[in-house]
Regions:
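Dual-mode signal for accessory low-complexity, basic/Gly-rich regions
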Residues: 45-302
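Internal alpha/beta scaffold segment
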Residues: 1-55, 59, 63-67, 110-111, ...
Length: 302
C-alpha cells in the first residue's frame, strides 16, 4: 500500500484503541504555562498542538462527533458485559472523588476532563488527575444511538469505496501502541518517507473486496487524523468491545504540562463499537521489512 484515501472501518477493539489514542487527548483541559521566554511559550504551544491538548478548549457547545454518538467518562463500573474495566479509581491524585462526566452528547462537546488546576473550558475538577501529573480518562464509554450489524457495516464500507471509484476498501482490526506509532512516524519523516509525526501505526490492516476476498497489508500508518475525521464518522456497529492499556500520551508525544520525568502512565479503558470513518489517509511505511525466518521455529507445532 503506497497511499489510500477513502473509507476505513475500524472493528470494535481497534475503534476503542484509536479513540483512546487520537480522540481522548483532545478531551483534556490544560492551563498553558506562562513565562517571559517566547521560545519556551512557542515550544509548549507546538508540543500541546502536536498532542492535541487544549484543541477542544474552544469547542464546547460545538459538534465534534456525529449526532448518534455519546461519550462518557465513568470511573465507577468495574466491568462491561463481563470484560474488566481497569481505569476506575476511588479518588484521584488531587484527592478529588471522581464522578461520571458526560463529555459528548449527541455529537456535541459538553465538558472536558480536568484537575484542580483551573483551565480554559473547565472551571472545576472532574476528579481526573492521574499518575502522569495531568488529567487523563478513566473508563471512556462511547455509546451509539444508531447502530448497524457487522454485515451492514461491511456493505456500507464497500459502497462508499465504490462511489469513490475504488475497487477495494480497508478494515483495521488492531492498532499499534501509541509510543511505537509516534516513533515510527518521526523516523519515517526524517528519512523522507512514510507518515508525518502524529500518525498512528496500525498493527493489523486488511484490504477487502466486494467478492469477499481479503488481503493482509503490512506497514500501514494513518497519515494524519484531524478532528474533522471524527465528525465525519458515518456509522457505528452494534457490538461494543473493550480496550484497556496505558494512556501513552506523555510517553508518545513528549512530556505535557504537569508531567514529570519518570512519571507513570495511567491505565485507561475504552468501550466503543466498530466505527466507519468516511475518509482517512493511510500510507505504507517504506522498507526494508524484517524477512521471515529461513527455517521454522523448533517449537512450532508443539
Amino acid at each position: 500500500l503506497e497511499r489510500y484515501n477513502g473509507p476505513v472501518l475500524f472493528e470494535a477493539p481497534a475503534a476503542a484503541e484509536i479513540l483512546a489514542q487520537q480522540f481522548a487527548p483532545r478531551l483534556l483541559a490544560f492551563r498553558e504555562p506562562v513565562s517571559d521566554d517566547p521560545r519556551f511559550d512557542l515550544f509548549i504551544g507546538q508540543t500541546m498542538s502536536q498532542m492535541g491538548l487544549g484543541s477542544f478548549a474552544d469547542r464546547l457547545g460545538s459538534r465534534v462527533l456525529p449526532d448518534f454518538l455519546d461519550v462518557t467518562d465513568d470511573p465507577r463500573p468495574r466491568d462491561f458485559r463481563g470484560a474488566p474495566l481497569l481505569g476506575g479509581q476511588a479518588v484521584d491524585d488531587d484527592g478529588v472523588v471522581p464522578r461520571a462526566t458526560l463529555l459528548v452528547e449527541r455529537g456535541v462537546l459538553r465538558a472536558l476532563l480536568a484537575t484542580r488546576v483551573p483551565a480554559r473550558g473547565a472551571p472545576r475538577s472532574t476528579g481526573s488527575r492521574r499518575e502522569w501529573g495531568g488529567p487523563a480518562p478513566s473508563n471512556l464509554v462511547v455509546a451509539a444511538t444508531r447502530s448497524a450489524g457487522e454485515a451492514q457495516l461491511r456493505r456500507d464500507l464497500l459502497e462508499r469505496a465504490r462511489a469513490r471509484g475504488l475497487d477495494h476498501a480497508v478494515v483495521v482490526r488492531r492498532v499499534g501502541p501509541a509510543a511505537a506509532s509516534t516513533a515510527l512516524s518521526r523516523l519515517a519523516a526524517q528519512m523522507g518517507g512514510g507518515a508525518e509525526p502524529g500518525g498512528s501505526a496500525l498493527a493489523e490492516v486488511w484490504r477487502v473486496f466486494a467478492d469477499g476476498r481479503e488481503e493482509l497489508l503490512r506497514g500501514v500508518e494513518i497519515a494524519e487524523m484531524p478532528p474533522a475525521a471524527f465528525k465525519d464518522i458515518a456509522a457505528a456497529g452494534d457490538r461494543p468491545a473493550v480496550w484497556s492499556g496505558e494512556f501513552m500520551m506523555g510517553a508518545a508525544h513528549g512530556l505535557g504540562p504537569g508531567a514529570s520525568v519518570g512519571s507513570e502512565q495511567p491505565v485507561v479503558s475504552c468501550v466503543a463499537p466498530a466505527l466507519l470513518f468516511e475518509e482517512l489517509s493511510l500510507v505504507g511505511a517504506r522498507g526494508p521489512f524484517p524477512a521471515p525466518p529461513v527455517t521454522p521455529s523448533p517449537l512450532a507445532g508443539r
